[in-house]
Amino acid sequence: MVSASSLLLAASAIAGVFSAPAAAPVSENLNVLQERALTSSATGTSGGYYYSFWTDGSGGVTYSNGANGQYAVSWTGNKGNFVGGKGWAVGSERSISYTGSYKPNGNSYLSVYGWTTSPLIEYYIVEDFGTYDPSSAATEIGSVTSDGSTYKILETTRTNQPSVQGTATFKQYWSVRTSKRTSGTVTTANHFAAWKKLGLTLGSTYNYQIVAVEGYQSSGSASITVS
């Protein structure tokens, strides 16, 4: 059974505790970064894919790029926040396939994750999660059926938090899959269209779009391949 304190901590995560990654500078030596484990924030290209790894620096997390669309992440210590994964430097209404293993212990998400600007929006299409269901701490405003499951649609607001445009106040859009999975295809256009029908309009300019693992005050491991 989850304790009351754990529930309060989990509820705060979606409401504003999870720290969104700011745009980290692209490394000057991407070939070196591709071949070593990362423990501090970085972005770049690896195996023909864009990658983004952000950490608040307070937890024990290691991110490693593999061949093509593969990456791995492990985290310990039950503290701190990170987000990392592979995908594309510019998002779009693409179909994204992924497969792999995802073994969280505590608060964590596996999702298609990205940003837009004008306006500034952070979005999640959550495919799997750890002990905390992110849809439990916000009001469901709709749903969409896509890729073999129903997704709950949520909207939250972040105030004076890190973003791809520095510290800012912005909306978060969420689709949370009701039948969790660790492999499959995500048709992002279906989610974007469903959000728009509910008045959740993405920005006119797409920033990066990745299949990400995120952890908050938890531990675990994952190995994901994106295509």
UniProtKB/Swiss-Prot annotation:
Q: What induces it?
A: Shows constitutive expression during the early stage of tobacco leaves infection. Expression is not affected by the fungicide carbendazim.
Report activity regulation: Significantly inhibited by the wheat xylanase inhibiting protein I (XIP-I) and the proteinaceous endoxylanase Triticum aestivum xylanase inhibitors I (TAXI-I), whereas no inhibition is detected with TAXI-II.
Pfam families reported in the protein's UniProt record: Glyco_hydro_11
| Protein name stated in the entry | Endo-1,4-beta-xylanase 11A
Where does this protein act, in terms of pathway?
Glycan degradation; xylan degradation
Q: What does this protein do?
A: Endo-1,4-beta-xylanase involved in the hydrolysis of xylan, a major structural heterogeneous polysaccharide found in plant biomass representing the second most abundant polysaccharide in the biosphere, after cellulose. Required for plant infection and the appearance of secondary lesions. Is able to induce necrosis on leaves, seedling growth inhibition, induction of a ROS burst, electrolyte leakage, cytoplasm shrinkage, autofluorescence, cell death, and induction of defense genes, and this abilities are independent of the catalytic activity.
Catalytic-site annotation from UniProt: E122 (nucleophile), E214 (proton donor)
Q: Please name the PROSITE patterns in this protein's record.
A: GH11_1, GH11_2, GH11_3
What Gene Ontology cellular-component terms does the record carry? extracellular region
Q: Which organism is it from?
A: Botryotinia fuckeliana (strain B05.10)
Q: Where is the GH11 domain?
A: 37-227
Chief subcellular location: secreted
For this protein, what reaction is catalysed? Answer: Endohydrolysis of (1->4)-beta-D-xylosidic linkages in xylans
Gene3D superfamilies hit by this protein: 2.60.120.180
Q: Which GO terms describe its biological process?
A: xylan catabolic process
Q: Where in the cell is it found?
A: Secreted
